[in-house]
């Protein structure tokens, strides 16, 4: 289980987030641009440090301001799919996916087996030699996810993984994305602003405003209006403001 209780002062507001995500659970983090969603992912990944608080995985602290613990990003074993995918444009699809394994010093033969299995599962084996700069948006998304998954991460973080795709490709990718993530059976957080992602991918959804979690429901509850009888008027308006279906 991933447990987060952190505070960080930002330019326009203070980020204060308290969350827990179970193994195998996909949490959808929903909110407007600039509300702190990506910052929270970066705090979990170790790319930025909270001012105070604690982040732990299965009871082991990876950040604790009181105990002066701040595990390096590399040692946190996190698979991170950035919004722009962050593939190396001059490298082939194969080399991009193999990159994390090579930094761990695995033998080439083992890397070959693992990368082939991952590329075949992602439907990318046929374009393994293509440079990342020449493949489609959907292929980049699959390659970025394959690179994140192949290292057998303890946590998966995905920042707007479908935003660069057109609407038709987004619809086709949602089911595949959920299946690929669930194979890992680790706590996963996906940042999105689209309730279609919540409906098709997530197990639970949290809404963030100005650095704070203002609403948390299961994905089914979020999408099933009949179950919102106990929701406040403001909560319903918040959900409706993101509904695009």
Each language-model region and where it sits:
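Conserved ABC ATPase signature
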Residues: 131-135, 139
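Catalytic Walker B motif of ABC-type/P-loop ATPase nucleotide-binding domains
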Residues: 156-160
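Conserved ABC ATPase "signature" region
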Residues: 60-65, 102, 109-127, 178-182
């Amino acid at each position: 289980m991933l447990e987060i209780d952190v505070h960080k002062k930002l330019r326009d507001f203070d980020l204060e987030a308290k969350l827990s995500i179970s193994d195998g659970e996909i949490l959808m983090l929903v909110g407007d641009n600039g509300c702190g969603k990506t910052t929270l992912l970066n705090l979990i990944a170790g790319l930025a440090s909270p001012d105070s608080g604690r982040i732990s995985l299965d009871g082991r602290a990876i950040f604790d301001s009181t105990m002066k613990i701040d595990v390096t990003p590399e040692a946190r074993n996190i698979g991170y799919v950035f919004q722009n995918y962050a593939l190396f444009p001059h490298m082939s699809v194969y080399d991009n996916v193999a990159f994390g394994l090579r930094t761990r010093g695995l033998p080439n033969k083992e890397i070959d087996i693992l990368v082939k299995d991952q590329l075949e599962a992602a439907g990318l084996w046929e374009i393994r030699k293509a440079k990342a700069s020449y493949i489609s948006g959907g292929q980049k998304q699959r390659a970025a996810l394959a690179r994140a998954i192949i290292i057998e991460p303890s946590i998966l973080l995905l920042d707007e993984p479908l935003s660069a795709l057109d609407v038709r490709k987004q619809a086709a990718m949602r089911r595949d994305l959920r299946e690929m993530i669930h194979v890992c059976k680790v706590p996963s957080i996906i940042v999105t602003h689209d309730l279609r992602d919540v409906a098709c991918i997530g197990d639970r959804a949290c809404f963030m405003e100005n650095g704070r979690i203002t609403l948390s429901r299961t994905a089914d509850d979020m999408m099933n209006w009949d179950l919102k009888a106990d929701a406040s008027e403001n909560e319903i308006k918040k959900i409706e403001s993101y509904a695009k279906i």
